[in-house]
A protein has these predicted regions:
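PAPS-dependent sulfotransferase catalytic core
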Residues: 1-47, 53-57
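PAPS-dependent sulfotransferase catalytic domain
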Residues: 50-156, 167-181
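PAPS-dependent sulfotransferases, especially Golgi type II membrane carbohydrate sulfotransferases
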Residues: 1-6, 120, 147-209
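Generic structural marker for isolated residues within well-ordered, non-membrane alpha-helices
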Residues: 20, 142, 196
């Protein structure tokens, strides 16, 4: 069957908007929204849920980001209205603070990314992309999509603007925002105490020491 749509999953600040826009624009694919398997930032649905949907024509895109740059981004804007004062916490307190149904942001990162790997192996059409790799070499990701979709003759339309749920913005320095910041040793130790080494390895990220 010909793939004609995409459903993007990934945590907040992991490039879901930019990567989804890129795939849709370059290959003329329509977006599947909330009514198709829910919130894009959720834990990936299990087979007993997604099997109730027509997924044969859909490409599932799973977006990931290095936790050491992702956590400061979440700290700055967690998009978490249940506890507005969460933004007032220090980074070290924030990364240990309960969020959604998870012990903290780090365990949430572990579990959600694990769920994306699991679902990517279950569904017929899927691709996993690290946001850092996408911004470093969009041509390579375009080639991966072209091979997967068997549409090698599509021209490359690069995505150089920052994109969030409110649209495209040219003023943000994306490369700098994706760099791992200089974290305090105490912060690194706290983060590492919760990070799954197995998940880090699957995501092709390395633990800071």
């Amino acid at each position: 069957m010909k793939i004609d749509s995409i459903k993007v999953f990934g945590e907040r600040h992991s490039g879901t908007n930019a990567i989804g826009y890129f795939a849709g624009k370059n290959f003329n694919l329509k977006f599947q929204h909330y009514d198709f398997l829910g919130w894009k930032h959720r834990l990936a649905p299990k087979k007993d849920e997604w099997s109730k949907f027509e997924i044969q024509n859909c490409l599932f895109i799973f977006c990931m980001r290095n936790p050491y740059s992702w956590l400061p981004a979440m700290h700055k804007e967690p998009y978490y209205d249940h506890y507005p004062k969460i933004k007032d916490l220090s980074l070290e307190n924030f990364v240990q603070f309960s969020i959604e149904d998870y012990e903290n942001c780090i365990t949430m990162w572990n579990q959600k990314n694990d769920s994306y790997f699991r679902m990517s192996e279950e569904v017929p059409n899927s691709i996993i992309i690290n946001i850092e790799d996408f911004h470093a070499d969009q041509k390579k990701f375009h080639e991966r999509l072209a091979d997967l979709l068997s549409r090698q003759n599509m021209p490359l339309v690069k995505m150089n603007d920052y994109v969030n749920g409110r649209g495209r913005h040219e003023q943000k320095d994306i490369a700098s925002s994706l760099q791992v910041p200089a974290l305090e040793k105490s912060s690194i130790n706290i983060i590492n105490s919760f990070l799954s080494t197995e998940t880090m390895k699957k995501c092709n990220y390395k633990l800071l020491t």
